[in-house]
Swiss-Prot record:
Taxonomic source organism: Comamonas testosteroni
Parts forming coiled coils: none
Protein name: 2-aminophenol 1,6-dioxygenase subunit alpha
Pathway: Xenobiotic degradation; nitrobenzene degradation; Xenobiotic degradation; 4-chloronitrobenzene degradation
Family named by the database record: Belongs to the LigB/MhpB extradiol dioxygenase family.
Length: 271
């Protein structure tokens, strides 16, 4: 089996930066738990897709062996900085660059000092303990012009490239659920999902994921994305579906809660 584990985790930095806030701390603990499950699956590489690595020209793959620095989130800068030191599997990333045009997608590698690693990738790496020598990454960008279908195709080709290199793969989709944020300042201890309808939609979709009902999930996703203004149309879930060839038996929701009004969940998929 090439894919040995799969996870969906939030891209918000709030659980990492302010774990003392109860609801955010629960998400941080859940993400750390997901990281332990990932490590237990013994992958050779982790395929990561973050909705916050935005691209408009080509599909980008991170081909720099080591990326390090300090990142300041453009929205949550008042809560602190995000230091990172991330290792990449360059052989597999280069294979993804080469394979992408064969699937109708223009692609290029990104390898230069100071490239701005996004918040979601950094947070996932920090809390899950990935992007290390033991668990190097292959990171694909979120091209704003790519549909969910293309995103699935990219994840599938990355898995195929890993199979060609005889590598065990963990898959991580980084992003949120419902997208309504509070526009006014709130007490973080009183954070909640912004409205009841968003919460209902989140819980409905999480139940479908838990049940492994992929057919019903695919039917619900476009409506959910529109009605609840889901983070980037739920392309991070499309990434997971593509890597899993559209099949999984169920999932465990390790955590669900608010991130300044928006929805966030930590999910471990059963393969």
């Amino acid at each position: 089996m090439t894919v040995v584990s799969a996870f969906l985790v939030p891209g918000t930095p709030l659980p990492q930066l302010k774990p003392e806030v109860p609801s955010w701390g629960q998400l941080a603990a859940a993400t750390e738990r997901a990281g332990k499950a990932l490590a237990a699956s013994r992958p050779d590489v982790v395929l990561v897709y973050s909705t916050q690595w935005l691209a408009v020209l080509d599909q980008q793959w991170l081909t720099r062996p080591r990326s390090e620095g300090v990142h300041v989130d453009e929205n949550w800068y008042e809560f602190g900085d995000l230091a990172y030191d991330i290792r990449a599997d360059t052989a597999l990333a280069e294979a993804c660059v080469t394979s992408s045009p064969l699937h109708g997608v223009h692609a290029r590698g990104v390898n230069y000092d100071g490239f701005p690693i996004d918040t979601g990738t950094i947070t996932a790496c920090t809390l899950m303990g990935i992007g290390t020598d033991a668990f190097p990454l292959v990171v694909g960008s979120n091209n704003l012009y790519h549909s969910g279908e293309i995103t699935e195709k990219l994840a599938a080709l990355a898995v195929d490239c890993a199979k060609d290199q005889n590598k065990r793969v963990a898959v991580v989709g980084v992003g949120g659920l419902s997208g309504s944020l509070f526009r006014e300042e709130i007490d973080p201890r009183e954070d909640r999902i912004a409205n009841e309808e968003d919460d209902k939609w989140n819980r409905r979709v999480l139940k479908l994921i838990e049940a492994g009902d992929v057919s019903a999930l695919r039917e619900a996703m476009p409506v959910y994305a529109k009605e609840a203004r889901v983070d980037m149309g739920f392309k991070h879930l499309h990434w997971i579906l593509g890597a899993l060839k559209g099949k999984f038996s169920g999932a465990n929701v390790l955590g669900y809660g608010p991130s300044y009004g928006s929805g966030a969940a930590v999910i471990e998929f059963r393969l």
